[in-house]
Amino acid sequence: MSVYHLPTLLNPLVNAIFNCPEPERSPLKKLFANLKTRRFILLAPPSEYLLNYHDVKSKLPLHDLCYNAEFINSYILLMTENSYINTNSRDSHYETLDGKTVVIQWKNNVIHALNGFHIRRRLKILETKILPNFNDYFEGAADFIILFIDQPLNCEFVPNDYLQCFHNYEKIPKNAHAMPNLSIDSFQQERSSFENILHIHPARLTQLGQLFSSYRTLAPGDDPSRSIFESIVQQAFDGMKSDSLFKNFSNLYDLIHDYFELNLYDDIWSRLTTHFKGHEVDTEKYKYFSVNQLLTDFYSKDYGEFELHDITLIERRLHLASKHLQKLALTHSYAEKSKILVETLQKLSGTTEMDSHQLELPDGLNNMTMDADTLISLFVLVVCRSEQKHLKSHLYYLQNFSNNSSSTKFGILGYAVSTLEAVVCYFEDFNKNTGNVAKANTLCEKTKNLLDKLSCENPTNEVEDLATYKDILTYRNEQGQSILSICITNHKNYILLDILSEYETDFPVEDLLEDETIDGSTLLIESIKAGNLEAAKVLIKIMLFNCTEEELVSYINKTDKYARTVAHYLTHEMDILKSIGNYIDWKRKNSSGQTPLFSIFRSYDQPNYEEMVKTAFDIANTWYRKHNSLFDYLDHTDNKGNSLLHVLKTNIPILLQLTKLDINEENYKGLTPLMVYVKYKRLSNIDAITKDRRLILEKVQNSTFFTCFDYAKDHSVLSKIGERGVKDSLFGLIYFHSLRYHNLNATTNITSVSNAEKPFATTVINMKTIQGLLRSILKDNPFTFLPLNTYIDEISHLNRSDLTIIGKTDVTSLLHELTNCFNVLLFLKKIPENLFTDEASILYWMRINTSKRNQKPSGKENPKTMEPEEINMIQSFLRFNFDEISSFKASLNILRKVLIFINLKSDDFEDAYKGLNEMGRKLINSEASSAFKGIITNHNMFSELSLAELLENVRFLEQCTIQLSSFVQIILFEKIPNWWKHYGEFLALHKSYRKAFPNMVKPKSASDTSSRAPLGGFIETKREQSEQRLAVQIKASSKMLKELGSEIFVAHERLAEELSNYMEFRKACLDQRSLVAFATTNISVLQECV
C-alpha cells in the first residue's frame, strides 16, 4: 500500500478515521481492517468540543481520545440492508461498532443513544455531509455519510484550562432553570407542608369542615359577614397554635386565613354579589368615554405645549391596563385581586415594562404630571373599557378580607385600593347626573350619535351639521382611533374632507403626523389597510405640500406593533408607491424580518404583479443610489432565511441581473429558490433561472437530501429542469433524473437531445429496461472502458419503496453514473441519438441488436494462428498503453484527492474562522475581543459549482481509466504470458518429436495410424505408440495456441478500438468538458465576489 500524506483535517475524529497516512502502522489498524469492505456512518461531534474539551474520567483531551479505538467505536454506525428502508412510522435502529444501540429519527434530525451507553443522550443532527472516499484502505463505498452532532456521545466533558481567559464559555445546560425567589418559595413550601399535615390528620380536617359549615349557616345570604369569617379563622388559629404539629410554621395565621379563604370564597362571593345587586356600577352607558373628556386640562394646553403623541402613549397604556384589569373577574382570593389591581395601576402609570414596541417610544408623559386626579380619570376609562360588572364587590372584598388590615391602608396596595374606591365614587356621581356630570353624559350621547353616523353600516356619507359635533371631534375610541381614523376605516371620505377643511386649526399637520392607534398604525397605514386609497391620496397630498423631507421620511417609516411601515402594506397601490417611494426606508424590516420590497414581492394576489414588482425594485434601486450605495440583495432576507429570489412569483430576470447574487442560497428549511419554484410550479421562473450559469441544479436539501427533482410533480416542470441537466451533463446529450417507485418497480425520467420538433424530450423509462440495455451494449462491447457491470449490479439493488438519506445518496450517485455513461455512448455513437424517444424504441433496438449479434459468425470457428512476431508487436503496443494509462490513472488519483481536499479545507477554514470569532467575542479583555471583529477571510478560492462539476468528471474518468487498465492488464499480464508458455511447450514438443523421429516429416495424426492397423488386435510397437502420443500432444498444443492467439488477436483489435475511443473520450472529457469548463465557470463566478 502506498504511503501518502494529505493535509490534516480540522475535526480530529474525521481525520483519525479517514486520513491516516500509514494505516498498517496505525494504532487503529485493526479498526481499519474491520471496516475495510464495510459501509458505515460516522457520528462526528463539533470540532469546538474535540479541540477544546477533555474527558472528566480519563483527564485526556478529546482530540487524543479520537485515536483510541474504544472511544471511536461508539461513533461508527454499521449499515445493514435495513439501513436503506425508511418508514415514517418508526425510527431507524443502528448498531455501533462496539455493539451499542443508536436510534435515528431522520424526520426530526434527532439521535438517541440507548442500550450500551452509560450516558443516554438525545443528540441533535446539526448537518449531514457526504464525504467522498479519498483514502486507499476503505473499499466498502465511494462515499461515506458523516452526521455532525451537537455534542460528544459517550463521555462527560469539560473545557480545557486555557479557556479560563474567556468568560461564559460553557454553554447553558438545556435543563437549567432560573433561581427561584427564596422568600416566595419558602412560603409555598410552608403552605404545601400545612396542607399535607391536614390531609394526614382527618380529625383536623373534620374540625375545619365544621367551621366552614358554621360560616355557611350563620352568615346571611345577602351579607358576606366579615366578622363571622374573622371569628372562625381566629378560632381555628387558637386551636392550632398550641398543637405540636404546627409549632414550626412562622406564618400559621396567614396559612389558616388563606386555607379558609380558599374553601369559602364561592360562599363569600355569592353573598357579596347578592348584597350589591342593583347597586353595582353599570359601565355600559359610559362606553363612549374618551381621553379628551376626562383629561380636559391636558387638551386645553397652549398649542406649543400640546403634543398628540402623549395622548397616543396614554391610549396604549390604557389598553394594556384594561386588558389586565379584565383578569380581576378570574380571581378567587384577596392576594390575586390585590396583585391584579396593583399591576393594572403600574401599567397605567408606566412604571412597569411594556412591550418592545412601546419601549421604543418617547415618554410623552414626562410633559404632564401624573397626579392623583389624572390617575383616577384614566382609571375610570380603564374600568369602562374592561367592562367590570362587580366593581363594588371587588372593592369590598379588598377592603375587608385581608389577613392584614394595614396592607389596604398603607403602601402601594393601600394607594391602589383608595384609587379604586375613588373611581367607584366617581361613577356614583355620574349616576346623579348633575353639573359637570350632566355635561359629560350629554357628550357621551352626542359621541354615540356621531359614531352611528360614521359607522360603515350607515350608507350616508355626510353629516348635516358638522358644527354641532365640534366639541367631540377630538374623541378617541378604545382602539386609539381618532375621528379621522374612524372616517378612514369606514370610508366616510366626504366627512373626512369636511373635517380637514373646516377644522384645520383643530387638526394641524403636526397632529396628523402624530395620530396613531394603540397598535401604532398611522392615518396613512390605516387608509392602506382599509383599502381607502382616496383617503390615502388626500393624506399624501397634505403631507407633500406641508412637510419637510425629514418629516416625510420620519412619518412614512413609522412602524406599528408588527414593526411594519406603510410600505409593508403596499401590495397593489402603484400610484401611492410612486408618490412616496423615495421616502421609504427600503431596508427597514418588520418583526418577521421582511423589508417593504420583500412584502411587495410576496403579495401574489395583485392583478398587476409584474409591473408592481418592477416598479418597486426600480424605486428601491434609486433609493440605494441616493444613499450612495449599490442595491444589496442580502438586506432583504427574512427571519426564515428566505431571500427575494425565494418569494418572487414571476419576473426574476430583474434579480438575476445582479452581480453579487447567490442564486443557490438556502433558506432555513434548506430550500433553494429553484426548489421553491419547482414546488409551486412557477414555470417562468424555472425557465429563467435554469438559463443562469451560476445555478447548481442538484443542490441538496440538508435535512431531507431532496433535490429540486424530488419536488417536481408535473411533467412540464421535470422537462424544463431536465433540459438544464442535459446542458450541464458531460457531453450535453442526455440526463437521468427523478427516480420513482411504482409497486416496487423503479422508473426514471430521462431528458435527452431530440431530433424532433422540440430540441429536448423527457421520457419515463423502467430501470429494468435500462439494465437490459446495458447488458445488450456490454455484449456488443465486452472490452468497453465504461464500468457497465457495476451499473448493472447497482440497478439490481433498486428494490426499495422508500429510501433514507443513505439510499438517496446511492440513487443520486447511480443516476449521475448513468448520465455520464450514456453521454459517452451517445458521444461515441454506440447507440442512436433518438433511442430514448420512448421505452418501446429502446426495446425495439435491443431486439434488432440481439438479432444482428446472433447472425455474426463466431470467432472460434476459424481460429487465427498468431506468430511470435505478432504477439511481440501486440505486447509492445499494450505495454506502452498500459504504462501511459497507469501514469494517467495515478495523476487522476492525485487530482481527485486534491479536489476533495480543496473543498474539505475550505470548510475547515470557515469553521475555524467561526470558532475563532466565537471565542474572540468571549475574551474578558474588551480590546482584545474587539480586535477579532476586523478579521477578514477569503476561503472561497474556488466556486462550489465549478469544484463539484470537476470532481464528478474526474471521478468518472478515473473509473473508466481503471476499467480499461484492468482489461489491458489481463491481456498483457495473463493472456500473453499464457500464450508464451504454451508456445514454449509447443516448441519443446516439436523438438522432442524431431529428436525421436528424425525421419518423419511431420507428426502423424491418430486417424492415419489407426487406418493402417490391420483388423483384429494387432499389437503396435512401442515406437509407434510413442510417436502417436507426441502427435496428439502437438496437435492439442497447436489448437490451444490458435485459440489463445485468436483470443489475444480479437481482444487486441477490440482494445485498440476501445483505446482509440477512450483517447477521444478522455480528451473531450478532461480538456473541453472539465478543465476548460472549470476555469471558465470559476472565473466568471468569482469575478462577482470581487
UniProtKB/Swiss-Prot annotation:
One of its GO terms (cellular component) is late endosome. It comes from the Eukaryota. GO terms for biological process: early endosome to late endosome transport. One of its GO terms (molecular function) is SNARE binding. Disulfide bonds: none annotated. SUPFAM superfamilies: Pseudo ankyrin repeat-like, VPS9 domain. Residues 289-436 form the VPS9 domain. Coiled coil: none annotated. Belongs to the UPF0507 family. This is UPF0507 protein EC1118_1M3_1541g. It comes from Saccharomyces cerevisiae (strain Lalvin EC1118 / Prise de mousse) (Baker's yeast).
